Structure formats: C-alpha cells, structure tokens
Amino acid sequence: MKCIKCGNMEDKVIDSRPIKEGKSIRRRRECLRCGYRFTTYEEVQEIELFVKKRNGSIEQFDRNKLMIGIQKALEKRPITQSQIEDFVDQIIEECSAEKSPIIPSFVIGTKVMNKLKTIDEVAFIRFASVYCKFHDAKDFMNVISELKMNEGPSKSVPMLLQASSK
C-alpha cells in the first residue's frame, strides 16, 4: 500500500481486525521508510445485481424496494425489524449466488415467497396476493387450501406463479 506521506510502496501491517460483522477488515499500517502510520479498509466488492421485469425491461436491483414489499407483508406480525433486515440480506445473498447478475423478477419473488411461507403464513398470503395479482376471494381460498395440503414451502409457490401468469 502506498504511504500517503512519502509515497513509499513498502509498509508493514501492525494490526488487523474484522469489522462490520466480518464483512470488512481494518488494517493499521506503518510505512517502512518514514514510519508514518495509517489505516486501510478492505471490503469484498459485491456484484451489482439487475432485475429482469415481467415485461422484459431490466432495472438495477433496489434493496429498498424489496425491503418495503417484505415489510408490508410482515406488517403487524411478530417479526422484528432486525429479522426483516436479515431476511432481505438472505434473499440478496441467494440472488448474488446466481450464475448471472441479471435476476428475473419471478426468481426473486419465488425466493421471498418460499422464505415467507416458512416464517409466517399470513405474510406469505399477503405477499402472494400482491405478487401473484389475486383477483378475488377465490384466489385467497385456493392458496389457503394449498397451504393446508402441502407441507414443503416449494410445493405451492410454483403453482401460484403459473396461475398468476395466465
């Protein structure tokens, strides 16, 4: 690392600590020429994600938009804000692990619905009603009956997505 005082490229690391829950590293360095001490930070460069919408358009992934949708589904449910933020982080991590930085919106929606179904069925139904564009009470009843019949989270979600695309 180049010394900001003398420009020398040689230094030694005096101290190194993980910060931000292990997502960054803070290093205290000392220039081997002039002895000046300085701090550097290292972070993993995250892949920029994009969302391919149902109409074919592509837009930059918006964490806040995902957060708002999940918060609305979980409104007045026994889930803390910290749990919601962890939930959103998990969805983003799963999306970042995909092969392409362009994620179809239905993939994100499916991930959200699968996770919601395991933590809060009411929130799952709320989210599904908006995401799958329910038209009437019959749509709600169909999802509720599927929830009762299917134990695994992934069983009814693909059926919902197929029904919503008709």
Swiss-Prot record:
A zinc finger (unnamed) spans 3-34. Binds 1 zinc ion. Residues 49-139 form the ATP-cone domain. One of its GO terms (biological process) is negative regulation of DNA-templated transcription. Pfam families: ATP-cone, Zn_ribbon_NrdR. The keyword Magnesium does not apply. Its cofactor is Zn(2+). Disulfide bonds: none annotated. Keywords: ATP-binding, DNA-binding, Metal-binding, Nucleotide-binding, Repressor, Transcription, Transcription regulation, Zinc, Zinc-finger. InterPro entries: ATP-cone_dom, NrdR-like_N, RNR_NrdR-like. GO terms for molecular function: ATP binding; DNA binding; zinc ion binding. Belongs to the NrdR family. Negatively regulates transcription of bacterial ribonucleotide reductase nrd genes and operons by binding to NrdR-boxes. This is Transcriptional repressor NrdR. The lineage of its organism: Bacteria, Pseudomonadati, Verrucomicrobiota, Methylacidiphilae, Methylacidiphilales.
